[in-house]
Regions:
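Dinucleotide-binding Rossmann-like beta1-alpha1 core, especially the glycine-rich loop
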Residues: 49-129, 254-255
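C-terminal catalytic lobe of FAD-dependent flavoproteins
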Residues: 252, 261-262, 273, 278-412, ...
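Helical element adjacent to the flavin cofactor pocket in flavoenzyme catalytic cores
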Residues: 141, 145-199
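Short beta-strand to alpha-helix junction loop
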Residues: 58, 65-68, 93-102, 141-160, ...
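Local cysteine-cluster metal-coordination motifs and their immediate loop/turn environment
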Residues: 410-424, 442-461
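N-terminal Rossmann-like FAD-binding beta1-loop-alpha1 element of flavoenzymes
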Residues: 6-32
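Glycine-rich FAD pyrophosphate-binding loop
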Residues: 25-46
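Flavin-dependent oxidoreductases
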Residues: 18, 178-184, 189-283, 292, ...
Length: 498
């Protein structure tokens, strides 16, 4: 048995990280374990990057309740934790008169859910607001509380803030099984040893069903990964003003077109269920579907505008809504099961899971309070995570001042995104260190421009090698199985370290 904790959180995605952040407010010894080399690197890093108003969730469901509570919290979180967030509002766009009744239905559902700031607007008004929109638009639903966010940035910010307030995070640490004493969970087994605790919180995302089955809970619950494929367009081609959904289908919210906090336009996602929980590959059929759906909203979209593709997996579950009278079979699970003590179970957190994460964390605290846990506030808890400089967002005067303090901020490593050596070093030596190329990419946005890392990757590899005191051959893209270099090339004079 290694160390003893009050709470162990399994999973470092947005739900696990936000839970760690909110729990760090209290006098608890907390450990978060994440099986990958970085927090937030799966579903929380590859999604549509939106904060939903709440008009889509089925009335009476836990999704609807969590969405409504969490939506306004994001404004304060962005201010305190310093991640990118823009409450620009969002639109559901009808193309053709036959789609207008669906807008009315969404509007009425939003009102029933208590969503503020909803309005139905005319086709003429929609065309005025967004010049790129399909000229055949017949009307739109506008929700002023919708927003775009950096989802990985928010996850990292929450996790780092938790660390700054005393939470311990162990990456490359994979949950294997529970330790029991009678009907109580007293710890977890991992690939790095055993850890004892009084409470375990399951926030394992795509693997949350497997974790709960290990606890002997909900044997019929199943996560089915739902792949969503996306296209990223060059920011020079389109500058959309907001977020644009088509009218939704029974399976998903449809192929949307959205601006992003990084300036690019994003199209997607598809919604295809699969068995593989790791396969995030793109497909020809999937990308063709995204392009076709994107053209329905923004007809000028063309493949020549595409600079990158990606895919993400949503943890779609089959849990029925437990609100009496609500027939809905895909609700969130947030519970303390009766049959096992010391276990708080979170699962099936698909959309609007990102939006709902703060409310899920707060709900977890209330459930544990109801179960008898005492939450005593820390006197020295700091609500703020310090901001780190982002060179591309600074004025010339601010840049000069920063370079005077640290000349490394004057060395541009990624030209497309204007990322400097100073920014890279700050992330390598941050509370949650970036130790791979992709970890730096998610934090600084290097390698995401038109050249897609062609200019910076060798420079970043050298910086990581130097700062981590490792051979360049040991530097990876996203973990041990993804080394960037295979062997030194034949050289004339000097050595491969030069």
């Amino acid at each position: 048995m290694v160390l003893n904790y009050d709470v162990i959180i399994i999973g470092g995605g947005i739900v696990g990280s936000m839970t760690a952040r909110f729990f760090s407010r209290y006098q608890l010894n907390i450990l978060l374990i994440e099986k990958r080399s970085d927090v937030g690197s799966v579903t929380s890093a590859a999604n549509t990057a939106l904060i939903h108003p709440g008009y889509n969730a089925v009335t009476g469901s836990l999704k609807a309740k969590m969405n409504l509570i969490a939506n306004p919290i994001w404004t304060q979180l962005a201010e305190e934790l310093h991640f990118s967030f823009d409450r620009c509002g969002d639109y559901v766009v009808a193309v053709g008169k036959e789609e207008l009744p669906k807008l009315d239905a969404l509007y009425e559902r939003g009102k029933r859910n208590g969503v503020p700031g909803l309005s139905l607007i005319s086709a003429e008004e929609m065309r005025k607001r967004e010049p790129f929109i399909n000229p055949n638009v017949s009307g739109a639903l506008f929700a002023e509380t919708g927003g775009m966010i950096d989802p990985f940035g928010a996850t990292l910010a929450a996790a780092e803030h938790a660390v700054l307030n005393g939470v311990e995070i162990r990456t490359n640490t994979e949950f294997q099984d529970f330790l029991f004493k009678d009907d109580r969970i007293i710890g977890v087994k991992t690939n790095n040893g055993d850890y004892s605790c009084r409470w375990v919180i399951n926030a394992a995302g795509l693997y949350s069903d497997m974790v709960m089955h290990k606890a002997g809970v909900r044997p019929d619950f199943k996560i089915t990964p739902r792949k969503g494929e996306y296209l990223i367009l060059d920011r020079a081609d389109f500058e959309l003003k907001s977020i644009y959904f088509p009218v939704p289908t029974n399976v998903s919210k449809g192929i949307m077109a959205t601006a992003s906090v990084h300036g690019n336009t994003i199209l997607g996602p598809t919604a295809r269920e699969q068995d593989d929980r790791e396969d995030k590959s793109n497909t020809i059929a999937g990308l063709a579907e995204v392009l076709s759906g994107g053209k329905k909203l923004i007809p000028e979209v063309d493949t020549r505008h595409v600079i990158a593709t990606f895919a993400g997996l949503r943890a779609a579950g089959n849990a029925p809504c437990e609100t009496p009278g609500v027939d809905y079979g895909h609700d969130f699970i947030i519970e303390i099961p009766r049959k096992v003590r010391g276990f708080l179970n979170i699962g099936g957190i698909e959309s609007p899971g990102l939006t709902s994460a703060p409310a899920i964390a707060l709900h977890a605290i209330e459930l544990m309070r109801d179960a008898g846990e005492k939450f005593e506030k820390k006197r020295d808890w700091n609500p703020v995570r310090p901001a780190r400089p982002r060179f591309r967002h600074m004025t010339d005067a601010e840049r000069r001042q920063l370079i005077e303090k640290d000349p490394r901020y004057g060395r541009v490593v990624c030209r497309c995104e204007n990322v400097t050596e100073g920014e890279i070093l700050a992330e390598i030596h941050a509370p949650i260190p970036a130790t791979t190329y992709d970890a730096l990419k998610r934090r600084t946005w290097l390698g995401t421009g038109r050249c897609q890392g062609g200019f910076d990757i060798t420079r970043v590899t050298n910086i990581l090698s130097r700062e981590l005191n490792r051979s360049p051959l040991a530097i990876s893209k996203k973990g041990e199985a993804s080394k960037l270099l295979v062997r030194p090339t034949k050289i004339l004079g000097g050595s491969h370290e030069d």
